[in-house]
């Protein structure tokens, strides 16, 4: 396009910020030391887990990082909440990776279960991290994409996962709210997802599954709600056990498997043979969505700042009591 009105005004607007006169190498060194410490902490959190990327690949699976990289356009990943760990979990995270990325040129918000850490189990603080992601998608009106591989709730810490206003149930309410607002929630589902990992069928717009994916509820409290009596007693438990024995004789599909959710319930919109197939399915549905065109509100072609960004290491002081000119920051 590059044909904008009032070029004499917008292309000759006054600049802000002054050239750096006195570099501060000591301040630069202190800031870069903090940056390096943050980068190292993020690396340790990403590397932590009970399995490795190599072992996952040997089993025919991709890691969360590999799935994200396969989904997004190269160089567009903007990770967020990388060190968020409000409950001090042992792997230094909440077992999910999330952030912004472009898929075929369109920005989306991505949440990926970290399958190196307890197969992506729900741990304390994860629900709040999911809400941070969903709230950002809501605010920016971006599609929310899950790469789900969740082994359910970490049992010893159930009391820290489910309760609370921003606890285990709220992300599902938020997903439903996004649907009502016209913000799609698209889920690619891998592996076995019992209990808390299986509830994502309740609220997403589209579910795309790996052929070996499984998604089912679990726990006596949940099963009791599915029983006509409203609770589980010895008789009901015996019925469940006997049904499992009988089903095993007739090769009835396991609860939550692809034959159930693709052929019967319709929760799975599409099923693919491998990890990358699921990614391609997600991309297909992203392509169906409209995209905001930056040209709509542009008044001039974007340009890099006139002043070098490297100057910020000298301008922004480590000593927070020292003043600085915010226009010098804006100018870079």
Region spans (language model):
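Conserved catalytic cores of soluble enzyme domains
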Residues: 2-3, 12, 18, 148-294
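Short coil/turn segments at secondary-structure boundaries
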Residues: 49-57, 82-85, 294-301
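Amphipathic alpha-helical
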Residues: 56-83, 303-332
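Long, structured ligand/cofactor-binding scaffold of large enzymes
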Residues: 54, 58-186
């Amino acid at each position: 396009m590059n044909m904008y009105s009032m070029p004499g005004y917008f292309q000759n607007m006054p600049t802000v910020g002054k050239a750096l006169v006195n570099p501060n190498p000591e301040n630069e060194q202190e800031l870069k030391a903090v940056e390096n410490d943050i980068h190292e902490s993020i690396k340790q959190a990403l590397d932590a887990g009970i399995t490795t990327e190599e072992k996952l690949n040997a089993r025919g699976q991709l890691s969360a990082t590999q799935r994200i990289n396969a989904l997004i356009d190269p160089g567009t990943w903007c990770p967020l909440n990388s060190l968020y760990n409000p409950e001090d979990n042992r792997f230094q995270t909440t077992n999910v990776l999330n952030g912004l990325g472009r898929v075929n040129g369109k920005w989306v918000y991505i949440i990926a279960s970290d399958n190196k850490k307890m197969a992506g189990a729900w741990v304390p603080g994860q629900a709040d991290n999911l809400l941070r992601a969903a709230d950002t998608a809501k605010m920016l009106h971006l599609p929310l994409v899950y790469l789900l591989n969740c082994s359910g709730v970490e049992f010893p810490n159930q009391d820290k996962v489910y309760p609370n206003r921003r606890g285990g149930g709220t992300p599902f309410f938020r997903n439903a709210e996004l649907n009502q607002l016209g913000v799609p929630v698209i889920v690619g589902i891998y592996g076995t997802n019992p209990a808390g990992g299986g509830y994502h069928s309740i609220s997403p717009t589209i579910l795309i599954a790996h052929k070996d994916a499984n998604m089912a509820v679990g726990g006596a409290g949940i099963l009791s709600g599915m029983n006509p009596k409203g609770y589980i007693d010895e008789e009901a438990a015996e019925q469940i056990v006997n049904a499992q024995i009988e089903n095993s004789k007739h090769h009835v599909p396991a609860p939550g498997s692809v034959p159930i959710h693709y052929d019967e319930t319709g929760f799975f919109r599409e099923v693919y043979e491998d990890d990358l197939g699921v990614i391609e399915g997600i991309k297909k549905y992203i392509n169906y969505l409209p995209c905001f065109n930056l040209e709509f509100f542009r008044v001039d072609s974007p340009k890099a700042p006139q002043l070098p960004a490297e100057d910020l290491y000298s301008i922004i002081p480590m000593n927070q009591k020292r003043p600085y000119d915010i226009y010098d920051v804006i100018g870079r």
